């Protein structure tokens, strides 16, 4: 049974506050989602307008409202502005399973912030969303994301051939999983 509340949960770590993203955050979302390097493996073209950022925020809100997932804005405690996001989507409640996604402004790469945020949401997902399995689908050339999930205990299960059609082409994706039993052990 899902113990998550109707209110959007705010999570705190040593350096971060993970919170709901609102339309007030559109400029910050646009700033990093318009960066080609950030969007390289995101499945979308770099954003060209603020309306695309507002559409992304609307998608985040629909995940939570429809109980299909949740997406947190990643903020530094002392700043408050959104520097990335992370969360769950494609939640399948009857199978206690979801997919994880994350991205971070390039300015903050290599500082351990994504790992800190993802550790917090995994703990939340296992405890309050009663997840048993979290999947990560990652393009083979995206080595930094592969290393990150491997450090967090995810296991690569295989290659999903031509699994996604994005940016006018089919992409292979590695499928990784983290089970609640992996975390407990």
Model-based region annotation:
Residues 33, 42, 64-65:
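Hydrophobic residues in alpha-helical segments
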Residues 30, 54-57, 61, 122:
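A generic alpha-helix structural signal
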Residues 1-28, 32-36, 71, 75-185:
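Acyl-donor (CoA/ACP) binding surface of acyl/acetyltransferases
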